[in-house]
């Protein structure tokens, strides 16, 4: 039995909530064992397996982040969603980035592949 559309769609909100909370375990709970993460697409690095994914996200959740899902679409086991996150580096320095993520899910609703589409031009 495949994951439901609602279950897959909820991944977007859970992902942004986990990043905002700085909750590495919540992020990791979204991923299947053999998952891959490419963030951003085209940078030449694909993080393969939970250990590599954990190492990647450890530095992300260490930052103070605010985020919001702007749009999400589910087609089969794929979730395409647009979001903005603002990273606060200190009291006077922050950056906002607009990102499209494509996540593929397995039958249990776990993410098997995440590809993040953004470039420096998407930052302000």
Residue ranges and their predicted role:
Residues 14, 37-40:
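General structural signal for alpha-helix termini and helix-helix connectors
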Residues 47:
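Short aromatic/basic micro-patch
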Residues 1-33, 123:
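Short, low-complexity N-terminal intrinsically disordered segments enriched in polar/charged residues
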Residues 2, 23, 38, 44, ...:
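A beta-strand edge to alpha-helix "cap/lid" segment located at domain peripheries
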Residues 18, 43-44:
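Short N-terminal micro-motifs specific to bacterial/archaeal maturation
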């Amino acid at each position: 039995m495949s994951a439901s559309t609602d279950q897959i769609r909820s991944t977007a909100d859970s992902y942004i909530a986990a990043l905002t909370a700085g909750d590495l375990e919540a992020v990791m709970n979204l991923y299947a064992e053999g998952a891959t993460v490419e963030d951003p697409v085209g940078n030449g690095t694909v993080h393969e397996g939970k250990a590599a994914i954990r190492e990647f996200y450890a530095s992300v959740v260490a930052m103070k982040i605010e985020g919001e899902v702007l749009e999400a679409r589910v087609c089969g086991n794929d979730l395409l969603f647009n979001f903005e996150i603002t990273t606060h580096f200190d009291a006077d320095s922050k950056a906002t980035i607009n990102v499209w993520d494509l996540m593929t899910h397995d039958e249990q609703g776990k993410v098997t592949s995440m590809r993040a589409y953004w470039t420096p031009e998407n930052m302000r």
